[in-house]
């Protein structure tokens, strides 16, 4: 009801909302002209010789005028908000669910033209500590994990999906049924990999800890040295779990740090040496002093997201990046000791990819500055934190602030581990049941329409046409194993026969999670095929699509949707078009725009300079905005290219919506009649950004470049959301 509320405020008075049914009830309750005259005759019967009195004339005239005025007001309301009797209201179960979502989301006390993000998202932000996309992911994970928890699994002869289910069950059981045997298994593992925490010892070996953890578990708390399968370069990268370590530490240090001190004490009692105090055991204050040097530098380096990597590096290159802190002989010894003949081909031929070079360099610079024993102590401390979550309930709960958060976050931990070690098998049964042929056809149509919108919108542009054509061309016949074609290859890949063949080397899973992890890692290295699945969470953000590396024969990259993109809160085949194109359609458009701009960034300097020097609205509107009376919100939080990419994707999604709805006409949602189809698309497009760290800028900034938004919500010149420059 944004425009209606804005109109009411401009008139400085309130008015009741009158829908079609309410209007009919009101008209039925009013006396008609015939009934009025009849009533008047019965109440005041005139003499046969008398004419109607002047008062009667005036009453009849007033009544007629009143009815006409009421009708005029109603017609005005319908015309003003675009509500016509020919636009029906959708009251299906799906529509009612989206209507309920809007009631929970929209803050009608905020004018859309003042701050659209706050209008759509402020209620969400006030009620949730996570983003809307994370909310969709949590709903998806809840359904998938519950399905796997209830799956009956035989002891032997397990299918691929049953192996994934048993793996998940063995992990989640540690929080509900774990005991001393699980704790003892973790302690034994710590000794095997050389973790001496809580001792500070010169016998510690940083490379041994890193390589042994990576080789046994393909997991590490800070930095991971990973070899997934034979003849594949080692990948060195920051650990995904390290983000969790940083966030949990920050939370526990809040309010004076007593929670962190208490947690340290708990871990010391559980994992400390039984013989009593020793000189080489650090106190809590010494840990804090050490972390004051380590954590800020590692956290800054961890924040580097992209563009900082080295491929096909030799061992000598890696040693040089590490500042020659550790001699080459030690590196070679750890390669030989931890990676067997299936993987290890000798250091002369070993190739390494270093993701996030800054983090790698920072890690070894800190080790050089503080000493190997201190870095090994910190590695041990973070390792204990991670592995303690696979022990028993009372130890696991130490890590979390409440029982409720422990129950929820431990599920997410186990989901992440199962995803990492079993890939698509964890989601396969859910996909086979939920992703019906109707869904596949509908999503394929959605993709085709958005592709067509890009080509149609930029076909006449000599600058953009080539980039758009390459990014929207149909895939080659061998580009995907999926008969539906990208971006739904996960549907084909989740077939049980395909998964059973892919995971044939995986052993039957049992109730011991650490044993299952080691078995999965060994099996992964025994196959030449990649059993991994793209991560749902990347750099702390839930993603609904990912990009597939460009093949040698491919003209450009392609993208794939992830199963979470079809979660009902985000997508339904029965949803109104504005919901489809505002949510999933816009995400597809984001992916295509990402391909376009990645292609632009990879172009040669002359091409890139030629494009950026053109008087293109999408590239220069942000600059123009700084000269306007109302500068773009968040300027310069989004670079010119980022803003142009975001605006291009919104433009394509919106034009696709107009094409399939004959200009934006669609059924209304119950109790949200004033929201036209165009309005609704912008609402759901912005809703996906609710709660994100940069959500306000990703929502508000591009809208000011799209005249359709200002027209839909009638944003007047001078309002914050008025169109700065028309780019469509």
Predicted regions and their residues:
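Intrinsically disordered, low-complexity cytosolic terminal tails
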Residues: 1-43
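Signal-peptide-cleavage-adjacent N-terminal segments of secreted and extracellular proteins
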Residues: 60-143
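Helix-loop boundary elements of multi-pass alpha-helical membrane proteins
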Residues: 38-71
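Noncatalytic, helix-rich "gating/capping" subdomain that lines the substrate-entry/channel surface
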Residues: 141-463, 485-487, 491-494, 498-509
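Intrinsically disordered, low-complexity linker/terminal regions across diverse proteins
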Residues: 287, 293, 320-321, 325, ...
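Hydrophobic/aromatic-rich, well-ordered segments within soluble, folded domains that form packed cores
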Residues: 105-126, 250-268, 650
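Short, well-ordered loop/turn elements at secondary-structure boundaries
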Residues: 110-113, 219, 373, 545-547, ...
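Sequence contexts marking disulfide-bonded cysteines in secreted/extracellular proteins
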Residues: 89-96, 112-114, 120-122, 170-172, ...
